[in-house]
Structure formats: structure tokens, C-alpha cells
């Protein structure tokens, strides 16, 4: 987001006004510009490359095209737009110590900045709600949230984000009335984001704090449910081993099925942890900035401008973190390796997804996901009237597991 005050005048550059030698000062300034230019270029490259990789992986491999990963795609698009249309111009603003793109692009650039942050936090909020229904109502989940409904939700997120970001800025509702702000608005070379108090507080609440509170509340409920289900798994396994040891010895398949059931459940909870890391990282990166954003308009001189800009860039850097976090998922990790030609014959884009295995043979129905489609396997179920996870024989497609079992939703590729 834009810098408050005369941000382009200092922008964390070394203060050479007290240097005794002009040449030394100039050399320091040039070294600072080169160093910061390299760092900012690497940040832009990481954001763009990582999120293009995520979007391409989901688009290419059908196994990754789940409802949750549709929302992940929306999140990656917001980060990609941030890396292409926001961060480079912010870097140029800092390095050139002035704005060279005109008043129109200044406001448009600021609007895109607010749009990306708002779309990201709202998408994370939607993901939290998605996981809540997936783990608490798996029988209804697939009919409740289809891929078409997910597309509509994503569209609504971007429409709402666009209205809350572009409308107030393009209509100039954000503008402050003090003389320094008026002078900046009139100058083509000034793009410091002076705002009035009402806009700063209202936009922070609507675009960040409300979605954040919803996200934290819902995801805390999700983790409570996940913890309860893990305790149920432990109890069920203990009861199984205590009461049915002789049956297991007669039919090893039953024991293997229960172990596999628990494995699927644990993978679902690992997916929840991955999404929790994504949400936590976003919160840690952006919360300090939004706190300072409100404090700044209430007490102008309390927060140094350097701190404001630094926290703004911490938020920018968050856009490059998510692709690294997705590497926790074997699905994404294998897909990334395939796209980067680091893994030979390990993935295959096909009509029903892709297959993966440890020996590198494509097309084989092995690998940890396609095992779910074998005959006579046991699923985790929380059937009405029972407190245990019980076995169920038959062939069940992997895409339907989350509608068959209480706590084993494998429709999430962040496993």
C-alpha cells in the first residue's frame, strides 16, 4: 500500500547529509540503490515464479483440481498480481525516490494494492469455512460446495474486493484535507498515500480485521474438531487392538484397513496444518502493518515513516511465501518437480488426474493417492449411532472418500 507522508523522500535510504565528502555520499547512495534493487528484483522474481508454478500445476494436473485448490488458485492469482503490478512499482518508487508514472497510475496502483490484500484475506476466510464444512459435515460437503459453486464464490470475493478497493480510491473518498496532502495530490511526482482518518479505519476493518476475525474463529473450530477426531482415532485403534486381536490374526486385511483409515485421517489433519501455516503466515506478515495503519492516522508522528514502509514490504514478501508452504504437500511437491523437469516419469496429466509412484513408472495405479481406489479397503466412517471408525468393504473412488467418511476428506490435495 502507499506510503504515508513524504515517503519517497527518505525510503530507508542511507542518510548522507552529514557526510564530509560528497563523493563518498554519492557512492553510498549508488551502492544502496544497487543493493536494494537486487533484493527487490529477487522478491519480485520469487513472487511471480512461485505463483505461476502453483497456478500451472493446478491447471495441468487434474488430481490437483479440487474445490479447496480452486481457492488456492484464487489466492495465487492475488499474489501474482501483487508481484506483477504492485511490488515492481513500489520498488521503483523507493529506488527513484519519486513517482514517475503520473497521478492516474498512482491511484490505480494503490487500488490494485488494496485489491490484492483484500482478495487474499477474504479467500483465506473462505478456505477456513470450506475446511470447516469438510471436516464437520463430510456427508453433505460434496453437494454443499461443488466446483461450480466454488467458482461463483471466487467471483464474488473478487467483486467485493474490487468494490471495497477501487471505489473509495477512484471516487477520492480516501483523501485527507491538510495542506501537505493537497500538495501531494496535485504533484505528478508524488504518490504518498495520504488518507483521512475515517477511510483508514473503515478500510482496515472491512478489508482486513473482519475477515481476520472470521478466519481465526472458524479455523479454531476446525482444529478443535480435528483434535476431537484424532482422539477418536486413538480410542478406536486401542479398542480394536484390545478386543479384536484374534480376528486380526485371522484376517490381516482388517488390521491393514484400519491402519490405512487412520493414515487417511492423519493426512487430512496434516492438510489442515498446512492451511493453518498459510493463514498464520499471512496474519503475521500483514497484521503489524494494519495496526500501524490505524495508529498512524490517529497519531501522525507516533510511528516513524521508515517503520511504516518496512512493514508494508513485509506484507509484500508474504506473496512469495505460499508456494514454499505448498511444498509440504506431496501432491504439489511432485507436481512442481515434474513442471521443473526435476522428476522424470513421476506424474502424468490424464483424464482422471495423474498417477505417482516411488519407482517412477507413470500410468500405474500405485502411489499413496491411487491406493484409495483398490478393492476391499476400509474407510474412516462416523456412522450414525456409533462412536467408532468402522470398516466398509468395496470399491470407492478417491474423490468420494470425503463424502463417505466423517473425518477423512481426501478431496484436499494439500495432504
UniProtKB/Swiss-Prot annotation:
Coiled coil: none
Entry keywords, A to Z: Cell membrane, Disulfide bond, Endosome, G-protein coupled receptor, Glycoprotein, Golgi apparatus, Hydroxylation, Lipoprotein, Membrane, Palmitate, Phosphoprotein, Receptor, Transducer, Transmembrane, Transmembrane helix, Ubl conjugation
GO cellular component, one term: intercellular bridge
Residues carrying sugar: 6, 15
PROSITE patterns: G_PROTEIN_RECEP_F1_1, G_PROTEIN_RECEP_F1_2
Spans within the Extracellular topological domain: 1-34, 96-106, 175-196, 299-305
Composition bias type Polar residues, residue spans: 395-415
Membrane topology: Multi-pass membrane protein
Modified sites of kind Phosphoserine: 246, 261-262, 345-346, 355-356
Pfam families: 7tm_1
Post-translational modification: Palmitoylated; may reduce accessibility of Ser-345 and Ser-346 by anchoring Cys-341 to the plasma membrane. Agonist stimulation promotes depalmitoylation and further allows Ser-345 and Ser-346 phosphorylation.
Chain spans, region Disordered: 391-415
Lipidation (S-palmitoyl cysteine): 265, 341
Disulfide bonds: 106-191, 184-190
Short sequence motif named PDZ-binding, residue ranges: 412-415
One biological process term in Gene Ontology: bone resorption
Compartments, record wording: Cell membrane; Early endosome; Golgi apparatus
Cytoplasmic side: 59-71, 130-150, 221-274, 330-415
Family that this chain belongs to: Belongs to the G-protein coupled receptor 1 family. Adrenergic receptor subfamily. ADRB2 sub-subfamily.
The protein's name in its UniProt record: Beta-2 adrenergic receptor
